[in-house]
Amino acid sequence: MSGLMFRFPFRRFVATMPDKTKYIAKSGTYPKGFLINGVSSGVKAKGALDLTMLVSEKPCNAAAVFTKNAFQAAPVRVSRETLQQTKGQGIQCLVVNSGCANAVTGSGGVQDARLITALADKAVLGRGDGGLPSTLVMSTGVIGQRLKMDKISSGVMKAIEGLGSSHEHWMRGAKAICTTDTFPKVVSQEFSVNGQTYRIAGLAKGAGMINPNLATLLGFFATDAPVAVEAVQQILREAVDKSFNAISIDGDTSTNDTIAFLANGASGGPEIDVSSPAYEELKQSVTGIAQKLSQLVVRDGEGATKFVTIRVRGAATEADAKLVAATISNSALVKTAFFGEDANWGRILCAIGYSGAIVNPKATSVSFVPADQTESLRLLVLGEPQNVDEERASEILSHDEFGLDVDLGSGNHETVSWTCDFSYEYVRINADYRS
C-alpha cells in the first residue's frame, strides 16, 4: 500500500457571516442611581477599553451566580466571599477587567482581586480598612496570567473620573468587558410593578466557552426597584436558569463565569420580597431581559452564522427535557451540519439517543421550524422517518435563524434553549487566541 495516495472529494462550504451590528443598542432606558464607565487601563494592547466600573449612589441588595468549574478564578472566589460576608447587603461597586482572567494564579491572584476591592471601596466610598467590603470583582481573558496591578489600579482611578449615566457611558462599560465579542451587549427597559415604574439594565460579554451552568460569561443586571435581598437571590437564580443556563456555543465551561444582580431602590416604593404580590411580575421582567441578553451572547458566538432555538417537549421530567436540549446544543456534529446547511437529522437523533434522558424512539418526533414560524418540516414522526423535502430543508437552514422542535412523547415537561453553529472561523479564532 505504500506509495499510494487516495483523493477524496471535499465540498468546501462558504457561509456569509450575518450582520451583527443590528443587535447593538442605539439607545436605552437606564436605572436611577447607577453610574458607569469603561476605560483603557493598558492591560489590552493599542488602547482598547478593558476596565468597567459600575457604582450605585445608594447601597444595593445584591446576589451573584458563579461558575461550577473546579478551577474557580480568583475574582469568583473573592466576590463569593464578599457576598457571604455582607449577606448580599451594602454592595455599591462592581469592577470588571478584560484581557486577563486572573484564573489559576494561586494565592497571589486572590490577593490581587482583594486589592481591587479595597481600592474601589476606598476611592469610591471613602472606606478604609476594617469594614465590610462593598465591591464585587470580575475578570475575563487569558487563564494562568497574573493581573498587571499597576495598570488595573490606575484604570480604576481613571474610570472613577469619567463615571456617568448616559447611553454612551453604558455602551463604554459594555465594550470594556469584551474579549472575542464582535459587538457590545446592552439591554435595558422600563417595567411597571403595582403601578410603579422601574428600570433595569443588563450588560454581558461572551462569545466562546459558553455552556449551560455558565461559561466565559460575565454579566450584571442593575435595577432601581426596591428588592429585598432574599428576593434578589431567588429572582437571579430563576432568571439565569431560564436564560444563561439555557445557552451553548461550544460546550466549554470557564473558570470565571459570574452573573450579578444589584437593586438599589432609587425609584422608591415598598420593598418587594418573595411574598409580595409584585414578586412574580418583577421576576418575569428580570427573566425576560436576561433571556434577551443571553440570546445576544449566542448570536455573537465565535464564528457563528446561525442562531438556533431548540424546543424540547413531551419529556418525562424537566431534567430530561434540559438534558436533551443541552446534548443537541453541544453536539459538534449537529452544529457543523447547521453550518453546512445540511439537513442531516440523523445526527440530531443520535444526540437525543445518547443524552441520558428517558427516550422512547417510537414516541419521538423531530421537526425543523422556519424563522417565520410557517409550517414546520417534519423529519421524524413517532419514530418513523418522513419523506423529507431536501430543497425545503436547505431553504430553512439557509437562514441565519431557525428552530428545532423535539417531542419525546413521554410526558408533559418542556424546555427551550438556544445555540449556534460551528464554522471554520470558530477554529481560527480559538487557534489564534493568544497571538
From Swiss-Prot:
Catalytic function, reaction form: N(2)-acetyl-L-ornithine + L-glutamate = N-acetyl-L-glutamate + L-ornithine; L-glutamate + acetyl-CoA = N-acetyl-L-glutamate + CoA + H(+)
Keywords per UniProt: Acyltransferase, Amino-acid biosynthesis, Arginine biosynthesis, Autocatalytic cleavage, Mitochondrion, Multifunctional enzyme, Transferase
Entry's localization field: Mitochondrion matrix
Binding site for substrate: T179, K205, T216, E302, N430, S435
Gene3D superfamilies registered for this protein in UniProt: arginine biosynthesis bifunctional protein suprefamily (3.30.2330.10), ArgJ beta chain, C-terminal domain (3.10.20.340), L-amino peptidase D-ALA esterase/amidase (3.60.70.12)
An individual GO BP term: L-arginine biosynthetic process
PTM note: The alpha and beta chains are autoproteolytically processed from a single precursor protein within the mitochondrion.
Gene Ontology MF terms in the entry: glutamate N-acetyltransferase activity; L-glutamate N-acetyltransferase activity
A family per Pfam: ArgJ
Pathway: Amino-acid biosynthesis; L-arginine biosynthesis; L-ornithine and N-acetyl-L-glutamate from L-glutamate and N(2)-acetyl-L-ornithine (cyclic): step 1/1; Amino-acid biosynthesis; L-arginine biosynthesis; N(2)-acetyl-L-ornithine from L-glutamate: step 1/4
Residue positions of the active site: T216 (nucleophile)
Site (Involved in the stabilization of negative charge on the oxyanion by the formation of the oxyanion hole): T140, G141
EC number(s) stated in the UniProt entry for this protein: 2.3.1.35, 2.3.1.1
Chief location of this protein within or outside the cell: mitochondrion
Role summary: Catalyzes two activities which are involved in the cyclic version of arginine biosynthesis: the synthesis of acetylglutamate from glutamate and acetyl-CoA, and of ornithine by transacetylation between acetylornithine and glutamate.
NCBIfam families for this protein: ArgJ, PRK05388.1
Family in the record: Belongs to the ArgJ family.
Note: This protein may be expected to contain an N-terminal transit peptide but none has been predicted.
Annotated protein name in UniProt: Arginine biosynthesis bifunctional protein ArgJ, mitochondrial
Source organism of this protein record: Schizosaccharomyces japonicus (strain yFS275 / FY16936)
